[in-house]
Amino acid sequence: MVALMDKIAQLFRNKQYSDLIQLIDKQLHAKNEPEALIFLYAIQGEISFKQKDWIQAFAAYEKAVAESKQKGLPTQVYAQIVQRQMIILLRLQMLDTAFGLFSENQSVSVDNVQVLAQLALLYLMCERYSEAEKLLSSIVESSTSNTITLSKQFKEDIGPFKELFGVLDTYDTFLATILNNLAICNSKLGNHTLAFDQFQQALDIIKDPEKITRPPLSPITVLFDNCVSTVDEDKEKALKVEHHMLTINESKENQEDDTVLSLLRDGCTLIPSSTLGTHLPLIIELHSTICYNIGKLELTLGNLDRSVNHFKKSIEYQPSFARYVALGLVYRDMRNFYDAAEMLTKAVDSCVGISNLCLGEVVYNLGILVSEELKMPYKSLQFFDEATVLFIRGEFSAGAILSRIMKANSLTTITTATAVSSDWEFIMAFLNTLYLDLCAFSKDQGFNVEAAFTGTNAISFNLPITEPQEKESPKSDKIASEKPLVESNPGRSRTPSSMNDVYMLSAENLSFSLLESSFAQKETITSRLFPTFQAETKRYLAILYTNLGLIYYRIGIPTYYKQARRCFEVAIWFDNDCVFAINYLSVLLLKENSKTLAIEGLLKCTRLFPEYYEPFYNLGNILKADEENKKALQYYSRAIELNPRFLDGYLARGVLYAELHRFETAYLDFSKCIELDPDNRHAFCNYIHMKQILGIFHNDTLDMRKISKIIDDYIHEYLTVQNAINKGVVLPSHPLPPIMPYHCYLYRLSSSQLRFICQRYSEQNVNWVKQNIDMMSTPLLDLSIHQRPMPPSIGLINSVSSSSQLQLSMLPLNQSAADSMVPLAMLTPGPTLCTAIGFQSIKSVIRDSQHITHGPIFSYDRALITLARSKHSSKCPISYIDIVNLKSPLRLGVLCDDINSIPIGCILESWLRNIDPKVASLSIYSTVASDKSALRTSLEAHCSNFIDFTNYKYQNNPFLCAQRINGDGICIMISMCQHNCGLEGRILAMRPAPIQISYWTHGGTTNSNYLDYILADQYCIPPGYAHLYSEHVITMPGCFICPSHSMHYSNAILLEEHADILKVTVEEVRSLIQDSKPDIDVNHHSAAGENILSLDGSDATSSSVDSGIGSRTHSEAPIGGGDKDEGAHSSKILELELELAEIAKMKGETKNGVSTNSASEGRDELLMNDRILITGDNVFFQVQPIRNGRLVGGRDRSMIKKMEPLLKAIYPLQRIASEAAVPASMEKSENNSDLTSHRVCLELPLYRKNIRALYGIPANCFLFCTFNQVYKFDMGTLGIIAALLRSVPNAYYALLKFPPASQLHIEAFFRHKAPDILDRVIFLSMLPMKVEHIRRYLAVDVFVDTLKCNGSTIVLDALWSGVPVVGFVGEYILSRKTLSFLSVLECKDLICASQGEAVLLCTRLAVDSGYYFSVRKRILKNRSNLFNISRWCDNFVLTMMLAYKNWIFGGKPTSFSTERVIANVKSQGFSWPLKSTGAQ
């Protein structure tokens, strides 16, 4: 008998089951003892159990139990047989029978404790946690009180059954297992603290096993290449399957009954079993399993770090599929994606015994992780292929289709980057096949998509999606009324935050672990896809269609938007609450100008699923476009709150913060973007720009190199795409460069890189016009009312107007899309040139606008003169002026995107006041809304044709804006906009005017074909630099910038203050300035007086005309006192009489017979005819000086509040001392005891030392300054500051808090690099009043400009104040403006070739007083060369006429110099006056 049992055990050990079955059958027919029969039946049941022959196994075990009644079985063996029977009944879904294995109301005793442990396990599997906890607690109590007896029971010899069941439990392992299961029960019941204690007790009972040395984890790159081994034949079958029936006849080994498994989803516990293989110690598996379960409990409580530690320890004891997956999912939740991918790859490599569905889902999650998070779409393809095969093996077609869709997404990403023709053909065919397969699969599920959509227009999400486009763009009132911060929907336990998260495995899919060899080990990872598909088939199909539609949309080709929309509509048809489909469909509706529907759809998303972040982001974009910035920030922040890793949300919010000048906050958002994706180009470039604005200069060199590398990579990608497009491949449009054209001049890029960036933006504008031109249907305008100004008829126009250069034939309206971009141009119906616009026929008015090659400056006046003389005899020569003058004023237009700013606004105001309207009329087109400032109000009042394109009539629509410009008959459009691909660029790309000129604001070339000229001077763009510009260069006389200082700040700094600085008399200063008296046409300034900012109350216009710019006449005494004894008494007293009580009652009333309405009509109460302000950081209020009587014109009590700080600010002036006393007092009116009237007296001038006292600057120091914005700084600028302060002992350096947040960063830089000079760096606040800013230059000795971007108005302010400016020179206009200013002032010696040379020059100015004073005198003497508005405007109008004449006579754009044209004409004996219409 012993020999027989040994033979049977050997066959069982060697898994020779066939021979063993034959032997058992033979022995069962023989006569055997009861002990032998029990063993034979147990062996027969074990073999059937391993072969999953459940009925045969249960029958064998039943016979073994029956035989045991005659011959008793050891307790451990009986417990194992009962466990097997329980497992079989669970497999057969016979729960009641399983519970029948145990006697009812059986009390716990030493004899039945092991069997009752199986009953407790059954309670756990059925989620009857309270009953399981009660029974397990009794087992623990009984076990601990009968330790000796139980120990003997576990040491009982079980004979041959030891070979059958392996190593059985000891008392310690049994008790540790019971405690583990009891801890699981308490965890499920919410007693987490007790559960932790019981887990720890279980670990304390069993001794810590000796650690096993294991090989380290393989590198991630190796793991990706060697992950899942799949037969190539299976892959080929999967790829060739047609439509939805993705089936394959594979072996179903390891395939479990999913219905039974659902009963065990969270009841996975330790089974008190001895089935552990003999090759591993039982103690190791117990430790590993308990550590895993502790990690699961920590994960449930949200302690990710602790969970990772326990999972790692579990894997260290005994690695397994479930433990690798658990650790990988935790790493993914911690955003440690590389480690997560490594763990999931390890899990796939250890997938022995795992079902195809479970393994396929893990591989699918690995593919999503690699594609979306690691940004390695090429690597993800193998995972999606493998997942497809596994789902096919598991007969889960819906999972296979989802995996194929995600593969298509990865292929699209790869193909977009490579732009290979064959790849695009493949992906398009693959997507079409996917769509057909998905439709067929839907049909098999009972949903005929094609039939449902035949004859229907769209599927609504409770909204009329197919509603026609609205004519007017809707406002965002509905969004503003919504509250973005809403509570989560309590009806759903887990709402996905993104579409990829819908069916991804998570911590919820992890269960407490069983022993490694247990039947239910695979259920430690519960499936998510298959149960969801079974429970919510329509919702699952909606997600499939949404994923497919999103791929079509992300391709970026407009022709595929229709297919994307169809997919989204089908998804909504399946699930009307599919927020993902509604969100993306709303985005498409925005592209189709269905704004109202889009907003309603997005708002529905926020109501259905408040945890979904993308609708909040899209609503934020809409609000931002509508300039609802505060609300947009709320929606962006809500999106980021819902998804803290939402890079686009941080990027959009950072851009908006930057536009709102909240630079520190923007910097933090861009820093977060870099943290999330260090390779994101747009995020990095915005991050670097914020660093420059804030003065953060660490790693500056590396940053510039990286930006250059980014642009090089971008150029390479763009050229690759363009080559493919040129070969006929249909590709999505390549995105714009990550740097704005204006900013690219700040990053030390090469000339070719700069030109390429600008060209891309220009191309984008042109392409936008091409794509959208057919959408408009505006009728033609009446030709008769849009005539251009023309020269007198001299027999020349008729021949020119009929020439081939201007005669434009009408082309068919349905011109192909391949035609070149069509500008708005001039039609030539007759001798008088006219224009017409009709968007249906714009393509028929193409004008040849190609630029000729740049060459030497060409003066075309000789050709004009020749043409004129050829038509007349020598006896009656024609004067050149007849050719120049027009029958009506030249119509100039200015397109401006920053008209509210002081520099541009002041320039335009000076044009309006100094250009003779009889010679040229000026129209202003603003693309920014009014800020209600006095400057904007003045411009709108004085410009006869001021158009605000933000008005509802134009809706920021480029077509409507271009139509208005063209309809106004503008001859020359002057662009004062930064080069962009927004509204301004699109307007210019349509060529609403025949001549378009770039002026000043961009700072370099636009590299476009729709801007003909760039306005410059001989210093900004000398002939040797013309090749850097695509535009033709118009060289103006003098400086190309028009400084308006002489009009706006006539005598902001008084003669006495100049004399004090130069240490000369007032008469010498007056003589110095009067020597440079310009030749000014007084008529041009007839209306300028009311806008001049004067300190003494005099009329600044007459002052500048009669006695030189900046001087003051003897005839006009300042307010508050005469000028009778000017040599002895140089101070001027300004008296301000303020009616603090009565002023509020004067609205519409009269006082002392004087009407108040006429004085204040149409003007700001605080901005009267003459203006005065008091110097000091705390005084920002403008007050009208009183000549006669009391102040009138106040309108409400708010004016009183504005006056109060002014009065209070007078008191600090009492502490300012000067050689002549500077009294400041507030005197109470003797006749008014109730303080209703006050008189304020302030002595002027204040002189340098008093100005310095106000700003906290040492009185006797030598003050350098750089008042440019900090983004213009670089490391060289900071190096100059440090070098100057070290080389000049008594020097201080003043910087502006421009922006305020930059101060901390610059101070930190000097504290680290040059702490010895930090206390001599002074930071001054920005002043809201320009005159006060100019007066602050009284405290400055030398202004040091910046190299990479020169200052503009800030440098002109310094020069107007007489402060020497040390400048640099670069390549483009942006870095050559200071050269132009100083050259006109005959101060070229202040231009430096290097920063080292600048330090030497500045040092010389500081130590050589003779040289310093000579420079200041030279600036004052020559400043009329730079600041003469009248002369500049005359030259400007003349230049515009020359450009227009060139076009009139059929000439193509060509570079020319106005000065040389005039000189050439005069050399021919012709005169050159400008005649107005009336003079002819």
Curated annotation (Swiss-Prot):
Compositionally biased intervals (Polar residues): 1099-1112
GO biological process: protein O-linked glycosylation
Protein name: UDP-N-acetylglucosamine--peptide N-acetylglucosaminyltransferase
GO terms for cellular component: cytoplasm; nucleus
Primary location: cytoplasm
PROSITE patterns linked to this entry: TPR, TPR_REGION
Compositionally biased region (Basic and acidic residues): 468-485
EC supergroup of this enzyme: transferase
Claim: Zinc is one of the keywords in the record: no
Keywords, comma-separated and alphabetical: Cytoplasm, Glycosyltransferase, Nucleus, Repeat, TPR repeat, Transferase
Superkingdom of origin organism: Eukaryota
Positions annotated to bind UDP: Q1269, K1272, H1333, I1334, R1335, R1336, G1351, S1352, T1353, D1357
Pfam families referenced in this protein's UniProt entry, alphabetically: Glyco_transf_41, TPR_1, TPR_8
Protein family (similarity comment): Belongs to the glycosyltransferase 41 family. O-GlcNAc transferase subfamily.
InterPro entries: OGT, OGT/SEC/SPY_C, TPR-like_helical_dom_sf, TPR_rpt
Catalytic activity: L-seryl-[protein] + UDP-N-acetyl-alpha-D-glucosamine = 3-O-(N-acetyl-beta-D-glucosaminyl)-L-seryl-[protein] + UDP + H(+); L-threonyl-[protein] + UDP-N-acetyl-alpha-D-glucosamine = 3-O-(N-acetyl-beta-D-glucosaminyl)-L-threonyl-[protein] + UDP + H(+)
Domain notes: The TPR repeat domain is required for substrate binding and oligomerization.
Enzyme Commission numbers on file: 2.4.1.255
Biological pathway: Protein modification; protein glycosylation
Region described as Disordered: spans on this chain: 468-497, 1093-1128
Location of this chain's protein in the cell: Cytoplasm; Nucleus
TPR repeat windows: 38-71, 113-146, 176-209, 288-321, 613-646, 648-680
GO MF, any single term: protein O-acetylglucosaminyltransferase activity
Lineage: Eukaryota, Metamonada, Diplomonadida, Hexamitidae, Giardiinae
Biological role: Catalyzes the transfer of a single N-acetylglucosamine from UDP-GlcNAc to a serine or threonine residue in cytoplasmic and nuclear proteins resulting in their modification with a beta-linked N-acetylglucosamine (O-GlcNAc).
